[in-house]
């Protein structure tokens, strides 16, 4: 049922080629970029699309508060941090596809959801399994399947 959302839109949600420093035209391209570590600017780009009260929450899913300044100085995230950021961008892309509105997508991502044990979808992006749960829910909503 689930497939990867449009990789170009995911890359765009990470800041596009201007922020990423390269063109991302396939999942393989994105995988290589994540494996090298995404630019810190991609985190800033993703975070600025969330409501002010959620920005710190999103940052902490990607990078612990104690490490944030160091990553900013280095200018690059570690691969594991990049994976978490990619998951957030992927969920945002899929939510925007389902809700057809960036505002509605952000509302969905940051509000507790009963099908996710009253956890906010964005909080589940910290792990691959949590992300899969959110993706499954979004695909069911997209295809009008029972949730």
Regions found by a protein language model. Give the residues of each.
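Non-transmembrane "mature" sequence context
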Residues: 1-147
């Amino acid at each position: 049922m689930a497939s990867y959302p449009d990789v170009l839109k995911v890359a765009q949600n990470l800041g596009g080629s201007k922020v990423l420093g390269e063109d991302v035209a396939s999942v393989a391209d994105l995988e290589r970029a994540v494996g090298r570590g995404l630019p810190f600017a991609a985190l800033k780009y993703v975070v600025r699309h969330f409501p002010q009260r959620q920005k710190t929450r999103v940052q902490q899913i990607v990078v612990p508060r104690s490490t944030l300044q160091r990553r900013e100085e280095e200018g690059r995230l570690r691969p594991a941090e990049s994976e978490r950021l990619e998951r957030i961008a992927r969920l945002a892309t899929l939510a925007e596809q389902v809700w057809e509105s960036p505002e509605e997508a952000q509302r969905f991502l940051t509000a507790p959801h009963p099908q996710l044990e009253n956890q906010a979808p964005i909080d589940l992006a910290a792990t691959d399994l949590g992300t899969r749960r959110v993706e499954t829910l979004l695909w069911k909503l997209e295809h009008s399947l029972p949730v």
